Amino acid sequence: MTVMDNPPVTMEDFFETSRGLWLIRRVVHHLDSQDDEAADSNLVIEPFNASDEAVEKVCKVFGIEASEANGGARFWWESNLLAEKRNDDYAAIVIDVPKPEHPDQGYLLRDVGYVEKKPALSTYEFTPDGVLTIKTRYDTNFGIERCWFVNDQIRMRVSSVQFLNGAAMTTYCTEFRCPSKADIEQIANQAKTFAQTNPL
């Protein structure tokens, strides 16, 4: 693990630093009559640049010129117990539209919102030390999410949702970067080479 002396403070860098597979351990507190929840899942993040066809497609939904966007990322939520193909029912495309005068601030255009399954517009802002705040107003609720890197292998994420009827929900997540298949194979080959060159 490496401490991040210069955490990402633009969405482009944040997406790139988040690239890959993450194990999410989350706890959800329902501040009404429902029981709390705890679960694990996987999250796959794949950033893309402004030339990706998704940029124009999603920007058109919001009436925003694609030239204002700076790429984005695809997200997939998966079970961490079953080997599954990626399911678009548990996926989202997020487009980054930074403010030209303030690259640490901007808008996120989502083809599908996290809370309400419809296109969603969010605002975002980074603090100088890399804490990302995302605010999203839906038709029937308002969400705030904060996310930051503890180091290059661990992310923290907290969020809250306030509904019109007053009921609220809070979520706390610790996210661990998972090694890729190539990483595992490389480590295995290194161990094999070490064992061959350093016999007992």
UniProtKB/Swiss-Prot annotation:
GO molecular function list: lyase activity
Pfam families: CpeS (PF09367)
Keywords: Lyase
InterPro entries in UniProt: Calycin, CpcS/CpeS
Disulfide bonds: none
Signal peptide as annotated in the record: none
Protein name (database record): Chromophore lyase CpcS/CpeS
Species in which this protein is naturally found: Synechococcus sp. (strain WH8020)
Lineage: Bacteria, Bacillati, Cyanobacteriota, Cyanophyceae, Synechococcales
